[in-house]
């Protein structure tokens, strides 16, 4: 009888080990993580051009050590095969193998990055698959600021570009930036905001690893969706963020803002001091952080300036895009030049410090633009752009339809 019981116990132990082996030995995620971070990289263009997404994911894996995530979880959703499918994966530290590993949590065989419902469900799935007390989101792809979607990228493209329009035509032989590509799979920023706001949970922050996304029109539309937004007012080189450096900061226990502040510095440090290690081999990187709770107050200050404007030389205004149509101009510099009331300018600058902390504003001496293959000097930097001063009649009309413009005029 005792021998029989012993055999049964041994059999149960063997079955238990067999079950564990089917469930990935070394993969033991917490039932409720302290934080889940989702890196969402829609589109194929950056992968086809230079395996930039694969390099980013590899970089995340290098950051995931036995201590970096703590009680957190790191998810990656991307499209390795084609533009109509996607995978939700988790990069975790396998204590048995003593290295990071990747496991696929969910596959999407019918995915469209331009479908708001699909993107909304993807965000919901991240929380279902990796429930946590707090959440962070990184979107890495192509970006074109506030320009309404119609055949470009997530989150913005161009509505009806004329064939001879220079605005989104990159120069022959230009280096890869995260600006143009994957036409036909895009979201409007208002659609992205809605997909975020409808969730039963809230992302603390959104990091845009995309070009031109630190523009006030976009940030204002997202002010109710997340608490903090990290982005660049100009083009981001194809390499994007140094994920091996920023991921550990995103899981630190010193507060969300502290981790994001360090992430901003790491981005700048890569392109200021270690740019020779990048594929782009370009010393070009500008970054900032927006405190979305301060943007309504900033809009109020801006509204008080509309009746105090004066003529100014637009050629003296700091811009963030190459070629003829600059489109993106430094917001604070614009107010400084166009407002005739020094007190109003000072009030605006004071609110800018609340909305865009100086500790998170970093820039190289110049930025590279794929639209003319040139480097352009940064002589004034507040970290955020505005398109209101653009002299092009076409973009003036479109910009006046943005929520930022309507709420400040």
Can you annotate each of these PLM segments?
Residues 1-9, 232:
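Bacterial N-terminal signal peptides that target proteins for export
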Residues 11-13, 235:
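Long, well-ordered alpha/beta core segments of mature domains
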Residues 16-19:
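C-terminal motif of bacterial Sec signal peptides marking the signal peptidase cleavage site
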Residues 21-132, 397-405:
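N-terminal extension/subdomain marker
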Residues 30, 163-409:
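Terminal, contiguous helix-loop blocks that mediate binding/assembly
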Residues 36-41, 73-77, 136-139, 204-208, ...:
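Structural recognition of the beta-strand scaffold that forms the well-ordered cores
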Residues 46-51, 84-86, 145-149, 213-218, ...:
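Extracytoplasmic/secreted cell-surface and envelope-processing proteins
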Residues 79-82, 90-99, 111-198, 210-211, ...:
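Catalytic-core segments of thiol-dependent peptidases
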């Amino acid at each position: 009888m005792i021998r029989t019981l012993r055999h049964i116990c041994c059999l149960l132990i063997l079955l238990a080990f067999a079950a564990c082996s089917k469930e990935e030995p070394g993969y033991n995620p917490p039932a409720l993580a302290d934080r889940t971070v989702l890196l969402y990289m829609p589109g194929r263009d950056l992968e086809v051009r230079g395996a930039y997404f694969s390099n980013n994911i590899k970089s995340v894996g290098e950051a995931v050590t036995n201590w970096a995530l703590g009680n957190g979880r790191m998810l990656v959703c991307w499209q390795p095969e084609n533009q109509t499918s996607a995978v939700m994966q988790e990069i975790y530290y396998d204590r048995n193998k003593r290295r990071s590993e990747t496991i696929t949590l969910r596959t999407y065989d019918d995915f469209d990055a331009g479908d708001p419902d699909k993107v909304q469900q993807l965000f919901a799935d991240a929380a279902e698959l990796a429930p946590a007390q707090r959440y962070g989101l990184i979107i890495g792809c192509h970006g074109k600021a506030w320009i309404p979607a119609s055949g470009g990228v997530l989150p913005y493209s161009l509505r009806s570009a004329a064939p001879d329009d220079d605005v989104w035509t990159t120069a022959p032989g230009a280096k890869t930036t995260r600006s143009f590509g994957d036409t036909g799979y895009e979201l409007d920023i208002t659609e992205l905001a809605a997909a975020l706001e409808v969730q039963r949970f809230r992302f603390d922050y959104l990091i845009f690893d995309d070009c031109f996304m630190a523009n006030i029109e976009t940030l204002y539309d997202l002010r109710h969706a997340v608490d903090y937004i990290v982005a660049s007012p100009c083009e981001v080189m194809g390499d994007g963020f140094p994920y091996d450096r920023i991921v550990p900061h995103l899981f630190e226990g010193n507060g969300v803002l502290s981790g994001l502040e360090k992430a901003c510095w790491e981005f700048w440090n890569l392109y200021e001091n270690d740019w020779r290690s990048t594929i782009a081999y370009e010393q070009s990187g500008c970054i900032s952080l927006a405190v979305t709770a301060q943007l309504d107050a900033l809009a109020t200050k801006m509204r008080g300036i509309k009746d105090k404007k004066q003529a100014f030389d637009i050629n003296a205004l700091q811009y963030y895009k190459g070629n003829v149509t600059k489109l993106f101009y430094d917001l604070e510099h614009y107010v400084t030049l166009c407002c005739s009331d020094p007190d109003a300018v000072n009030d605006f600058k004071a609110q800018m410090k609340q909305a865009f902390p100086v500790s998170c504003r970093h820039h190289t001496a110049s930025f590279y633009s794929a639209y003319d293959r040139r480097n352009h000097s940064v002589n004034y930097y507040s970290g955020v752009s505005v398109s209101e001063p653009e002299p092009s009649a076409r973009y003036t009309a479109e910009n006046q339809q943005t929520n930022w413009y309507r709420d400040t005029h």
